[in-house]
């Protein structure tokens, strides 16, 4: 008990890997587990189903994205390029 005060969900690693790494893991997991904006309906209801698979709880849209976030920096650039060509 008491291993998760500083590092949250990364407390499962115990004393291994160092505090900096465990804090980084906890930050990534916190962003991953929050609800994200749906690209189809615009609601903040997108949850991660599996690695890189995201689903909106409101409209049911399922789409591929990043492993930890629904949009990646490379995906944003690609979307911008496609929009400028159209």
From Swiss-Prot:
One of its GO terms (cellular component) is ribonucleoprotein complex. The keyword Iron does not apply. GO terms for biological process: translation. GO terms for molecular function: large ribosomal subunit rRNA binding; structural constituent of ribosome; zinc ion binding. InterPro entries: Ribosomal_eL37/eL43, Ribosomal_eL43, Ribosomal_protein_eL43, Ribosomal_zn-bd. Keywords: Metal-binding, Ribonucleoprotein, Ribosomal protein, RNA-binding, Zinc, Zinc-finger. Binds 1 zinc ion per subunit. Its cofactor is Zn(2+). A zinc finger (C4-type) spans 38-59. SUPFAM superfamilies: Zn-binding ribosomal proteins. Pfam families: Ribosomal_L37ae (PF01780). Belongs to the eukaryotic ribosomal protein eL43 family. This is Large ribosomal subunit protein eL43. It comes from Thermococcus gammatolerans (strain DSM 15229 / JCM 11827 / EJ3).
């Amino acid at each position: 008990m008491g291993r998760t005060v500083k590092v949250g969900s990364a407390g499962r690693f115990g004393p291994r890997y160092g505090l900096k790494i465990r804090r980084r893991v906890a930050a990534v997991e916190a962003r991953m587990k929050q609800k994200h904006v749906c690209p189809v309906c615009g609601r903040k209801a997108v949850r991660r189903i599996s690695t890189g698979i995201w689903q909106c709880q409101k409209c049911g849209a399922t789409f591929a994205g990043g492993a930890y976030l629904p949009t990646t920096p490379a995906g944003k650039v690609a979307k911008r390029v496609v929009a400028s060509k159209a």
